[in-house]
C-alpha cells in the first residue's frame, strides 16, 4: 500500500489523501467523497508515494426523482 495524494491541477489543493494498492492509471475514474474524478496525470510516483492530479467528471445520468408514497 502506498500513500496517494489527489490534487486539483489548477489550484494544487489536496482533495484527499489515502492509501491505495497501487497508483491509479491515467484516465481511470476515482471517487473522492461523493464526487467522481478522472485521473489526468501522475507526478512523482515512486514505490513509496504518488501525487495524482484529477479533474471532476460530470454525472452522466440523473436519477428520476419520485415523490414519497
Identify the function of each model-found stretch.
Residues 1-14:
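Short, basic/aromatic beta-hairpin or loop at an interaction surface
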Residues 17-18:
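Short, solvent-exposed loop/turn positions at domain surfaces
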Residues 23-24:
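Short, well-ordered loop/turn sites that connect or cap secondary structure elements
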Residues 36-45:
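Short beta-strand-centered aromatic/proline hotspots
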Residues 46-57:
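Short, solvent-exposed secondary-structure boundary/capping segments
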Residues 60-69:
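Glycine- and charge-enriched low-complexity intrinsically disordered segments
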Amino acid at each position: 500500500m502506498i500513500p496517494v495524494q489527489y490534487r486539483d491541477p489548477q489550484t494544487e489543493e489536496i482533495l484527499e489523501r489515502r492509501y491505495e494498492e497501487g497508483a491509479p492509471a491515467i484516465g481511470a475514474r476515482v471517487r473522492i467523497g461523493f464526487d467522481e474524478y478522472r485521473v489526468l496525470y501522475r507526478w512523482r510516483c515512486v514505490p513509496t508515494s504518488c501525487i495524482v492530479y484529477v479533474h471532476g467528471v460530470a454525472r452522466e445520468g440523473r436519477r428520476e426523482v419520485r415523490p414519497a408514497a
